Regions:
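Glycine- and acidic
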Residues: 30-38, 60-62, 116-120, 124-134, ...
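C-terminal, charged and often intrinsically disordered regions of DNA end-processing helicases
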Residues: 80-182, 402-403, 407, 411-412, ...
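Secondary-structure capping and boundary motifs in well-ordered enzyme cores
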Residues: 1, 135-143, 160-171, 200-207, ...
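A non-catalytic, helix-rich entry segment at domain boundaries
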Residues: 174-267, 374
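Non-catalytic protein-protein interaction segments used by genome-maintenance enzymes to assemble
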Residues: 257-341
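Active-site-adjacent bridging/hinge elements
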Residues: 23-31, 142-153, 209-216, 293-313, ...
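Conserved C-terminal motor-coupling region of P-loop helicases
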Residues: 1-89, 253, 300-301, 305-323
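Metal-dependent nuclease catalytic regions and adjoining charged, substrate-binding loops involved
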Residues: 67, 88-97, 104-105, 325-328, ...
């Protein structure tokens, strides 16, 4: 027994707590056979509540009026009973209410910046290769780049019971490689495509199994007979069939390379120090049509066709490519073009992406005219500036100012932007 009693969180759903039954026995049967039911638990709450109040001189019941995860902002039925019944019938009880408000000022979050100490710079230099995806990460958020490539914080790994986006894309790429690998160096004709389309339709299960076995991390997906993964399997079949039929309209063309690695070594003079960087890319498909070399990249994710298919009529667009992450496909296309042209100087080259979510539109070309040497040089000049910024010890890794960039970032909890 206490003279002064304070009870916190007297909200409906907390006091009494919401009842949930995990019993397989229906409520009516439990009630009939006098087994414990939710009403009994509520009665226990009521007993202990009023027993606590019985000999107290001053009782303070506190509840939260704000809605949240664990509260609907509604005061408990016990408070209503005290106000409307207990206080009304007992003249010795005086009940009154107070609404307390406070100006709460949340502490301002400090922006996170990572200085480029000698140790951090050494971590950057140990990064063997820089891909278009890696550099796009820096454009998106320098701090995210640091976490991923310098600090090498691993993203949370999950056991893949269902297809991840990565698994979907990797298996698609492997199937396309299997279908075209025997055609490298040959001119693909109408008849060959008709035969390929027919072969694919009749042997898809075998091709699927082969692709999953070649990608050893996806061996468990080789034999799918039911469930969501079977649906994904059928979606990939439809996508590949659409690609093959679209390729049929492009014949004749000659496949030069599939899933080939391309590299370019760059020497950067940063504050008088020479830093060697290797730029790397994996080209999905390189082909020749009408004496023009074409690099095609399959995209299983979402692509903004309005942005990616825009004609580049001025150099300002290349400037925006290095500032706007929404143009990352354009950045990747020019990045691949730069790698390829540095080892194939005489090629007339165009680059494009196969946006598989909008496959009906065919390939989106960066430009339908071959990339000029001036445009290539301008891109590489901007690329050098970006690389020097990454390795410049006077430029720290800072958070992006655009919160939208944090939406799918695996490290957003570190920055308190989740």
């Amino acid at each position: 027994d206490f003279d002064n009693v304070y009870i916190l969180s007297v909200n409906e759903g907390i006091l009494p707590a919401e009842m949930s039954s995990s019993s397989f026995i229906p409520f009516a049967l439990r009630k009939a056979f006098k087994l414990p039911v939710s009403e009994d638990t509520e009665a226990d709450y009521a007993y202990y509540f009023y027993r606590l109040l019985q000999k107290a001189k001053n009782v303070t019941l506190i509840y939260n009026t704000e809605t949240g995860v664990i509260s609907a902002g509604e005061k408990s039925r016990f408070i209503m009973q005290v106000e409307s019944e207990l206080a009304a019938k007992n003249k010795n009880i005086t009940a009154y209410s107070l609404l307390l408000e406070g100006d709460i000022e949340l502490p301002k979050r400090k922006e996170i910046t990572i200085e480029k100490t000698p140790q951090v710079l050494e971590l950057l230099k140990n990064q063997k290769q820089y891909s278009a995806t890696t550099l796009s990460t820096y454009i998106n958020c320098p701090l995210q780049f640091y976490f991923k490539k310098a600090a090498r914080l691993k993203e949370e790994e999950e056991v893949e019971e269902y297809f991840s986006a990565a698994a979907f894309g990797n298996i698609f790429h492997q199937l396309m490689d299997i279908l075209y690998r025997d055609d490298v160096g040959r001119e693909v004709t109408d008849e060959m495509m008709d035969s390929k389309i027919s072969y694919f339709a009749g042997n898809y299960d075998d091709l699927w199994k082969k692709a999953c076995e070649e990608l050893t991390e996806y061996k468990e997906f080789a034999k799918i007979k039911q469930g969501k993964n079977l649906l994904y399997k059928s979606v990939i079949k439809k996508l590949i069939n659409s690609v093959l039929n679209n390729d049929r309209t492009e014949t004749p063309f000659k496949i030069i390379e599939l899933e080939t690695a391309a590299e370019r070594k760059v020497s950067l003079n940063i504050n008088g120090e020479i830093t060697e960087v290797t730029l790397y890319g994996r080209l999905d498909r390189v082909e020749i049509k009408d004496s023009i070399t074409r690099i095609i990249d399959y995209k299983t994710g979402t692509v903004d066709s309005a942005k990616q298919n825009a004609k580049v009529t001025d150099f300002d667009h290349i400037n925006r490519i290095f500032a706007d992450i929404k143009l990352k496909e354009n950045f990747q296309q020019l990045f691949y073009a730069s790698l390829y042209l540095n080892s194939n100087n005489n090629s007339k080259l165009i680059v494009g992406i196969y946006p598989l979510k909008k496959i009906s539109g065919g390939v989106f070309w960066f430009e339908k005219e071959p990339i000029s040497l001036d445009k290539k040089k301008l891109f590489e000049d901007y690329l050098d500036i970006l690389l020097k910024k990454i390795f410049d010890k006077h430029t720290p890794f800072a958070q992006t100012t655009d919160i939208e960039h944090c939406k799918y970032c695996p490290y957003k909890s570190i920055c308190y932007r989740d």
